[in-house]
Amino acid sequence: MKTSALFVIFGLVLLFCNSFAAELEMTGRGCGGLMAGCDGKSTFCCSGYNCSPTWKWCVYARPGRR
């Protein structure tokens, strides 16, 4: 019983560390990914994305899109 409780706690700690590392990697970049907020002046989208003038977030770049 004690062993299974320790495994559950250990699993939750690993899950928390993994999500924290992913969030740190995401915010550490100087550009925004899909649906990240942007304004085109101080915050920019990563390559492959364009800043939507209507919604002010990054969307997939495709031919014909401004």
Swiss-Prot record:
Domain of life: Eukaryota
Reported function: Probable ion channel inhibitor.
InterPro entries: Huwentoxin-1, Huwentoxin_CS1
Propeptide residues per the UniProt entry: 22-29
Entry domain remark: The presence of a 'disulfide through disulfide knot' structurally defines this protein as a knottin.
Cellular component terms (Gene Ontology): extracellular region
Subcellular location(s) of the protein: Secreted
Family of this protein: Belongs to the neurotoxin 10 (Hwtx-1) family. 46 (Jztx-7/10/12) subfamily.
Primary residence: secreted
GO molecular function, one term: ion channel inhibitor activity
Miscellaneous information on this protein: Several genes are coding for U1-theraphotoxin-Cg1a for which the structure by NMR has been determined. The cross-references to PDB can be found in entry JZT7A_CHIJI (AC P0C2X7).
Disulphide connectivity of cysteines: C31-C46, C38-C51, C45-C58
Alphabetized UniProt keyword annotations: Amidation, Disulfide bond, Ion channel impairing toxin, Knottin, Secreted, Signal, Toxin
Tissue specificity annotation: Expressed by the venom gland.
Name of a matching Pfam family: Toxin_12
Organism the protein comes from: Chilobrachys guangxiensis (Chinese earth tiger tarantula)
Protein name: U1-theraphotoxin-Cg1a 2
Modified residues (Proline amide): P63
